[in-house]
Amino acid sequence: MFAVIKTGGRQYRVVPDDVLEIGKIAGEVGTIVQLGEVLVLGGDTPVLGAPTVAGASIAAEVLQHKRGPKVIAFKKRRRKHSKRKRGYRDEITVLRVTEILADGKSPTIGPRPKKEKAVEPVEGASDDKPRRAAKKTAAKTAEDAD
């Protein structure tokens, strides 16, 4: 099953477990958000919206918020010794589509648990090693200043 959704003025074709980058939306990392503007539900019997499919939504997990690549806007007026350089970076939210919901259902899949990184102590890397003493510098005398 697939769906075509609209968010941030753009349209995306999504299937469950898709990872997509969209314009920034509200939501903490790791939470489930619902996107409600579903234009098409596809599958065995496709459903076209007019303009949206009633009761359909997409459940997606927020993976991260980041900034997109820098876009440079450069304007030059020839023979006028005039130019302007500006740049900006879009705010982006990375989502993983968890499920496609029809008929006003609520999400059944929660956020995925984060994997704990096991930190194992390395043998032989203890803090019992003798430390080297700091190197002492000679004090300046009046003869050195001349």
From Swiss-Prot:
GO BP term, example: translation
Subunit field text: Part of the 50S ribosomal subunit. Contacts protein L20.
UniProt-listed PANTHER family: 50S RIBOSOMAL PROTEIN L21, LARGE RIBOSOMAL SUBUNIT PROTEIN BL21M
SUPFAM superfamilies referenced in this protein's UniProt entry, alphabetically: L21p-like
UniProtKB keywords: Ribonucleoprotein, Ribosomal protein, RNA-binding, rRNA-binding
Record function comment: This protein binds to 23S rRNA in the presence of protein L20.
Protein name: Large ribosomal subunit protein bL21
Encoding gene per record: rplU
